[in-house]
């Protein structure tokens, strides 16, 4: 399975100590160089702990950096470089999944994938956690704890209503 990630899900999962969950679902994740810079380079310069967590998974070979080859596809600059590169890398590598949280980037990715006939599906941080619960990587209690941890981090740009929806969805299931 080929999985490409943007910065957002990596940073969010690192902030709640859930990067191991990502690699419980996928053996490796591909990222463009711009995402490594956004998550590790910029993060280390700012001294944020989540950058060290992402760097540790990169050093362990779980996060593979793959260059985006030149593309005929022009993407608007309304989304950031990591998101644009993630979309292009997903097309280039015929990815099964693109992990991205930003709504504009998700909408653009859906449009581009449809136009290009790509079968790449899109999932964000919440989708990763719910899938981890669904597949048994996380227990219900662990999933709920991680979802609630997202609420405690206002710097993670996930809408509170979406987090609450995910909490309700997981809480409704019995183990």
What are these regions (language model features)?
Residues 2-69, 76:
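A positional/architectural concept
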Residues 1-2, 13-14, 18-28, 37, ...:
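Feature 3881 marks metal-assisted phosphotransfer/nuclease machinery
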Residues 61-101:
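Ordered, amphipathic secondary-structure segments that act as subunit-interaction surfaces
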């Amino acid at each position: 399975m080929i999985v490409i990630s943007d910065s957002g899900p990596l940073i969010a999962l690192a902030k709640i100590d859930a990067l191991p969950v990502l690699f419980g679902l996928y053996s490796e994740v591909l990222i463009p160089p711009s995402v490594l810079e956004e998550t590790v380079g910029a993060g280390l310069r700012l001294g944020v702990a989540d950058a060290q967590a992402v760097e540790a998974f990169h050093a362990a070979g779980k996060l593979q950096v793959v260059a985006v080859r030149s593309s005929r596809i022009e993407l608007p600059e309304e989304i950031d470089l990591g998101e644009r590169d993630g979309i292009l890398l997903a097309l280039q590598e015929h990815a099964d999944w693109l992990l991205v949280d930003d709504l504009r980037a998700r909408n653009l990715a859906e449009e581009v994938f449809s136009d290009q006939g790509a079968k790449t599906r899109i999932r964000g941080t919440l989708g990763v956690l719910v899938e981890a619960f669904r597949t048994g990587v996380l227990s219900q209690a662990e999933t709920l704890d991680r979802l609630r941890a997202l609420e405690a981090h206002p710097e993670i740009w996930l809408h509170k209503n979406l987090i609450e929806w995910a909490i309700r969805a997981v809480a409704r299931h019995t183990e």
